[in-house]
């Protein structure tokens, strides 16, 4: 059981880090582009960065939340994490076209926060439920 807890904790930490990276990217890139409008920094605003982060966040989150649920049996927590992931997917794929930059930014920040919160709680509940 302790090996499963280790992999769950590692996945939770990675997902929290990636979620925060996504949120920071969303907040900092417009500021950096306004302060330093050079061609080098313009690649930071590329939408492929959002998709790349999603391709990392989704499997890590599914893995970690699934294994955490096996330990703590809290399906609500998994549903919260999946909701955050769905908001991130919506923000990356549709929000900009539907509501502009502000909807995309708001959705990304909301989704990232929900994903990070679900993994922080998954980490906490897995530790308290595990009798290793």
Segments predicted by a language model, with ranges:
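Functional transmembrane helices that embed catalytic/metal-coordinating motifs
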Residues: 14-37, 127
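Secretory/periplasmic and organellar redox-cofactor proteins
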Residues: 1-13, 39, 43-132
């Amino acid at each position: 059981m302790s090996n499963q807890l280790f992999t769950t904790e590692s996945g939770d930490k990675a997902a929290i880090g990636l979620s925060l990276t996504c949120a920071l990217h969303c907040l900092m890139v417009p500021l950096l582009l306004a302060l330093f409008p050079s061609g080098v920094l313009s690649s930071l605003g590329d939408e492929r960065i959002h998709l790349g982060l999603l391709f990392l966040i989704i499997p890590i989150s599914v893995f970690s939340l699934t294994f955490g649920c096996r330990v703590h049996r809290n399906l609500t927590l998994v549903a919260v994490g999946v909701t955050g992931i769905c908001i991130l997917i919506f923000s990356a794929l549709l929000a900009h076209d539907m509501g502009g930059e502000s909807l995309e930014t708001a959705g990304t920040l909301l989704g990232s926060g929900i994903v990070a919160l679900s993994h922080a709680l998954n980490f906490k509940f897995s530790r308290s439920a595990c009798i290793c």
